[in-house]
Structures are given as structure tokens and as C-alpha cells.
Amino acid sequence: MTKRQTRGAAREKLVLGAATELIAERGLANIRVTDVAERAKMSPGHVTYYFPSKTELLMRAIRQSEETFTDQLEDEIQGLADPWDRLSRLIELSAAKRPRDPGWVLWFEVWANAALDPQVAKVHEELDTRSRGILTDVIRYGRDQGVFTTDDPETAAALLAAVIDGVSIQLTLGAPHLDRPELLRLCAEAAQAHLGRRPVPPVTARRRTR
């Protein structure tokens, strides 16, 4: 890669980072090219050079966000041998962390635009298929290990993904009855409802000391 290409890639990354922050803060409809340029500390011309439209900016922002996330997710779960540990970690990383979770607010914008724009819909389908595939692989791994009691990993993944999405949407919107621990509890209950109960570790008695 030449120096010019390296500089270009760095500028593009800055624009994407600024756009992702602003979309999460204000929503796509409420940001302007000048807002992104100001946040990225560069000229509006640089922003439009890399991203001619806000739709293009949104698609690239969600793609970068999800690719970074899925790479991290795959690296982490591959190091876990226990199927329940893999699934629990996947849920922890995938689900919303707090109200107005930036990653989930970004997805709100993608869903809204995907309903009307075929280009955004295509990107959404691509990213959703990849993340669903990771979940399916985790469930299939647990089934093959004799731990998860399902004959249909694809359906189990679809059902569990629907629960993760549903409660994450509620938490992102600030539902008063839901916090992060409750979200994780609900996801764990859904997983066990479809995959079997997770064994409870035996309690080891402690020796009394005098």
C-alpha cells in the first residue's frame, strides 16, 4: 500500500468513526455532511469524496462495526471448549449493554432504511446471515458434543436470535422494567428452553478450620 493509499484509508476510517458516533447520537436523518466533517476534523469535501451519500455512509458504518464485532466474537468463543460458555459469551457480546447502546441505535437506522432501500436491505441481509451463522455454529457445536438437546440448530438459532434482538431493542429504548442483568437472564432462560437446562456445578464442601 502506498503512502497515499495509507493516508486515504486513515481518513476514511476517521470519517466512519465520526459518522458512527453521530448516527448513534442523533439519528441518520439529523446529521449533515458538515457535522461529520467537523467531528472528523476534515473538510466536507473529504467526506463526500469517500461517501457520496448518507446512505453509503450508513452502509459502510454498519459494515465496519459488524465486521469488527464478529471478528472479535469468533476469536473469543473459539477459545471456549464448553458449549454453554460459548453460547453465554456470544449472548453477552451480542446483546445491548445499556439504554441508547450505540451499536444497537446504528442497527435501528439500518432496519428503518432497509425497509425502503434495496441497497441497505442487501447489506442488512449479508450481515444478519453472518451473525446468524455464528450462532448456529455454536448451537451445532453444542449439539454435536451431546450437550444441547436440539435436532434443528438453524431453528433454535432463529428463535434465540429473536429473543436477543427483542430484549436488546427494549433495553436500548430504555424500558423501565429491563436492565442488563435481567436481559441476560431472559436470554439464558430462552436458550435453556430450546437447548436443555444448563447443569448446575456441584457445590464443594469446605473443610472447617479450627
Q: PLM features: residue spans?
A:
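Hydrophobic alpha-helical connector segments
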Residues: 60, 71-104, 156-160, 184, ...
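Short coil/turn segments at alpha/beta junctions that flank glycine-rich nucleotide-binding fingerprints
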Residues: 25-29, 80, 145
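Amphipathic alpha-helical packing segments from all-alpha helical-bundle domains
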Residues: 70-71, 75, 100-108, 118-144, ...
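Residues in soluble alpha-helical coiled-coils and helical-bundle/repeat scaffolds
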Residues: 52-56, 78-81, 98-99, 115, ...
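Hydrophobic/aromatic-rich alpha-helical bundle segments in the mid-to-C-terminal region
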Residues: 119-125, 129, 143-191, 198-210
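Helix-turn-helix
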Residues: 10, 14, 21-56, 60
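Short, basic, alpha-helical segments at the C-terminal edge of helix-turn-helix-like DNA-binding modules
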Residues: 63-68
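Helix-loop "lid/cap" segments that line or gate small-molecule binding pockets
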Residues: 76, 92-98, 106-116, 190-194
